[in-house]
Regions:
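N-terminal strand-loop element at the rim of the active site
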Residues: 5-11, 18, 23-68
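Conserved donor-binding/catalytic core segment of Leloir-type glycosyltransferases
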Residues: 149, 190-216, 228
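Carbohydrate-associated surface elements
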Residues: 154, 175
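Aromatic "clamp/platform" in nucleotide-sugar-dependent glycosyltransferases that forms part
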Residues: 256, 275
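Short hydrophobic beta-strand element within catalytic cores of glycosyltransferases
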Residues: 292-295, 305
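Conserved acidic donor-binding segment of nucleotide-sugar-dependent glycosyltransferases
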Residues: 307-308, 312-319, 328-333
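A short, well-ordered alpha-helix in the C-terminal region of glycosyltransferases
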Residues: 321, 328, 335-349, 358-361
Length: 368
């Protein structure tokens, strides 16, 4: 098949998932055309069946805000027309599904059929989509997509509730390449006996970074640990300032990385205290690296992180509950090791080899 994938090119979960999906589809013999405003951070173009098409938005002084959706739609039409594309798979409803629908209509006038599959990732529904400015456009985009998928049952239910839509939504969870993480685990050697607690995110307010830093501070006062924070975003400088003011020891703000598995393999506990989280791809990658998981109980996280089995779930703003959960693991090597092993077993259920065929089946259903 010849497939267009439209995604955000950033370190966020939707862009990472879309990129890894494209890589695996190419390995399976499909031709994959990525469209975005810049090259996705994890995109590897070494495979001759992967192509990247940049969306350029020409500046025109009449517009206070340059029309990205129009430029994206035009690029989709151009790529689809020149490459005999079978379908388009958009990740994140706004503006991608909306732009895909406009492109679909333009192509129809040239007697070219372009079916749309839209994957909902979370904040496109729970935050952006609920905003009055965007709600009608999001609902329209969902209803006009040929197939809609979501990354968790929680997100599926939220979508039906928020938008009062009867659109059928198929749950296809996020995935992880277990083989890649296994290879890293085999090479990984702990440098010392100090336990490491890690967080990975895009440092947006929804990730609840300020609560995280307060949790780290209380743990630091009671236990000798390392604290790793991977990622960048709007709350990063606030987090650094808080860590300095609270005099947290052994904390490392590591920035963005394309090789998160090299950090996670040295980690023991992963914490994700998000205010809302449709799935928690970062937590899944930590599970594949044999980390016990401490997370909030919001959104799709309880579907992934099974309380008292792979880790603990807490109310998102309950600092004391997070601290208590972490200390239970730090003071019981037996419990920590059991949770780490359970996490790894849970991650295997989400192996890329199990999940990508689910997308392929939907593609075949679209073009049959």
């Amino acid at each position: 098949m010849r497939i267009i994938i439209v995604c955000y090119p950033t370190f966020g979960g939707s862009g990472v998932l879309a990129t890894e999906l494209g890589h695996d589809l190419a390995k399976r013999g499909h031709f994959v055309h990525f469209i975005a405003y810049q090259k996705p951070v994890r995109l590897n173009e070494d495979n001759r069946t992967i192509f990247f098409h940049k969306v350029n938005v020409p500046f025109y002084p009449l517009f206070n805000f340059q029309p990205y959706e129009l430029a994206l739609s035009t690029k989709i039409v151009d790529v689809a027309s020149k490459n005999k594309i079978d379908l388009i798979h958009v990740h994140y409803a706004i503006p991608h599904a909306y732009a895909a629908y406009m492109a679909q209509k333009m192509l129809k006038s040239s007697k070219i059929t372009l079916p749309i599959i839209t994957t909902l990732h979370g904040t496109d529904i729970t935050l952006v989509g609920k905003h009055p400015f965007y709600k009608n456009a999001v609902k329209f985009s969902i209803d006009k997509s040929n197939i809609v998928t979501s990354v968790s049952k929680s997100l599926k239910n939220d979508t039906h509730e928020f938008f009062n839509t009867n659109k059928k939504i198929k749950v296809i969870p996020n995935f992880v390449d277990i083989k890649k993480f296994n290879n890293q685990l085999e090479m990984c050697k702990n440098e010392d006996d100090i336990k490491t607690i890690t967080h990975v995110s895009n440092f947006r307010p929804v990730k609840n970074i300020r609560t995280l830093i307060k949790v780290y501070s209380k743990i630091s006062d009671q236990f000798n640990c390392k604290f790793n924070l991977i990622g960048e975003g709007p709350e990063l400088e606030v987090a650094k300032s808080m860590a300095k003011d609270l005099k947290i020891k052994n904390i490392d703000f590591m920035g963005n990385t394309n090789e998160v598995e090299k950090v996670l393999c040295h980690s023991d506990i992963f914490i994700l205290p998000s205010k809302t989280e449709s799935f928690g791809l970062a937590a899944l990658e930590a599970m594949a690296s044999k980390n016990a998981i401490i997370s909030s109980n919001r959104g799709g996280l309880p579907e992934l992180n099974i309380n008292n089995k792979t880790g603990f779930t807490c109310n998102y703003n309950d600092i004391d509950a997070y601290v208590e959960a972490i200390l239970k693991l730090l003071t019981s090597e037996k419990l920590l090791e059991r949770f780490k092993l359970n996490s790894y077993k849970q991650a295997q259920k989400y192996n890329i080899e199990n999940i990508v065929p689910m997308y392929e089946a939907e593609y075949k259903r679209l073009i049959k």
